[in-house]
């Protein structure tokens, strides 16, 4: 295999603990909107709904604005809350998502260790308002070389169109010299395969992968990315 010259990092669930940010943001918004207590059971219910809506986006069934509001509309209807509050709730939620910054284990150390050795980019399907705040508050916007947010790019992972500006920006680095690291099989790994990029599935939970998806690497600890990069240079 070719030497890895660029690492493309997914953000939510790979570099940053999305579930921690999600939990804090929802609880804050429930309080701000006077919706009462948001229990852990309610957050788990919302999280499952949210995953389904994002997967529908990846399949091209809805637009980004539709899924952002639709997930809360469905959740509120299921909880007996007026769904009409969903648009305003989502707008505040996007702002609050960047309030809580928790790095996934060894993510910060790995990004720091790779600085100057390979090009490092964020490749994320999140919204611009949420991701800009997260990247700034975490310091990742100053550690990574380039940032690619689907809302700005105009395409979502796993679409090959998402990666077109990534390739253009990285110039002489070939797709096979890039490694995409992410926790999502449907957006990160499928996206990397679609674009001809080497793939690394971050799988800390030890989940089974579907046989039709053949990723190049599977890791349980982000620190393993450093080993993969070093091994490729030998």
Question: Model-found features: residue ranges?
Answer:
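N-terminal helical cap/lid subdomain that shapes the substrate entry/recognition surface
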Residues: 2-105
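Asp-based, Mg2+/Mn2+-dependent phosphohydrolase catalytic module
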Residues: 1-7, 20, 41, 108, ...
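Structured helix-beta-strand junction loops
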Residues: 49, 116-117
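Glycine-centered loop/turn motif at secondary-structure junctions
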Residues: 34, 80, 117-118, 139, ...
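Alpha-helical structural context
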Residues: 32-33, 78, 117, 169-170, ...
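N-terminal start-of-chain detector that recognizes signal peptides
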Residues: 71, 76, 92-95, 119-122, ...
């Amino acid at each position: 295999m070719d030497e890895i010259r660029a690492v493309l990092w997914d953000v939510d669930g790979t570099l940053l603990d999305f579930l921690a940010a999600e939990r804090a943001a929802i609880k804050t918004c429930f309080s701000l909107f006077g919706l009462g207590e948001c229990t852990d059971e309610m957050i788990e219910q919302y999280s499952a709904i949210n995953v389904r809506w994002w997967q529908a986006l990846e399949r091209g069934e809805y637009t980004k604005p539709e899924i952002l509001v639709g997930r809360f509309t469905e959740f509120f209807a299921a909880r007996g809350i007026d769904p009409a509050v969903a648009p305003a709730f989502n707008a505040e939620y996007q702002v609050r998502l960047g309030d809580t910054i928790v790095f996934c284990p060894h993510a910060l150390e790995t990004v720091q260790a790779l600085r100057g050795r390979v090009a490092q980019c964020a490749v994320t399907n999140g919204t611009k308002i949420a991701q800009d705040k997260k990247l700034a508050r975490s310091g990742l916007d100053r550690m990574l070389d380039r940032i690619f947010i689907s809302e700005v790019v105009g395409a979502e992972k796993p679409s090959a169109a998402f990666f077109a500006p990534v390739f253009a920006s990285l110039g002489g680095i070939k797709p096979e010299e890039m490694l995409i690291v992410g926790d999502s099989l449907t957006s990160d790994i499928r996206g990397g395969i679609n674009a001809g990029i080497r793939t690394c599935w971050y799988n800390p939970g030890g989940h089974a992968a579907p046989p039709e998806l053949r990723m190049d690497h599977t890791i349980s600890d982000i620190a393993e990315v450093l080993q993969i990069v070093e091994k490729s240079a030998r």
